[in-house]
């Protein structure tokens, strides 16, 4: 259970790096990743709704951010994936000394800490749904400034965000 986001508890000084096992890294990365996804989606999946994760906007945004970040770390896939998922879910495990990585990865990790996982998960951060809503609001306000008489609703999960929610 310590792989659940915000856990990060390890009795070892070198955390998960102590084991130096690709198998451990991938299993822990998987469980950290799913702990950053809305638990309601997992529940619906267990009830037989097998495609629920792929249909959920927030899950797709969260997964996209994670995949993009893994690719842009430009280090070994095993270490990059582990660190990215650990950072975005605020789990706190580590398997590599990312202080030795390129400087842009430090900025990326700070951004990932700020963004966080999905709503309804144990991950910290702003949450992927709020980031999605903010991006859509910025787009709608930009288009609205170009077309002041137009009406550009912001939709999140198929629903129009109210003006109170947009404020």
Q: Which residues make up each language-model segment?
A:
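Membrane-proximal intracellular helices of multi-pass ion channels
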Residues: 1-167
């Amino acid at each position: 259970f310590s792989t659940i986001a915000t856990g990060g508890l390890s009795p070892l000084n070198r955390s998960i790096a102590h084991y130096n096992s690709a198998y451990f890294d991938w299993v822990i990365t998987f469980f950290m990743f799913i702990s950053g996804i809305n638990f309601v989606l997992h529940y619906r999946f267990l009830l037989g709704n097998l495609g629920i994760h792929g249909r959920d906007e927030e899950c797709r945004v969260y997964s996209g951010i994670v995949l993009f970040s893994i690719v842009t770390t430009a280090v070994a896939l095993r270490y990059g994936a582990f660190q990215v998922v650990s950072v975005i879910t605020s789990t706190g495990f580590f398997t590599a000394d990312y202080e030795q990585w390129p400087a842009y990865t430090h900025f990326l990790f700070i951004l990932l800490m700020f963004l966080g996982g999905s709503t309804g998960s144990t991950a910290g951060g702003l949450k992927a749904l709020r980031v999605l809503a903010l991006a859509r609001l910025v787009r709608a306000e930009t288009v609205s400034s170009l077309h002041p008489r137009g009406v550009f609703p912001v939709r999140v999960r198929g629903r129009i965000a109210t003006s109170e929610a947009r404020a």
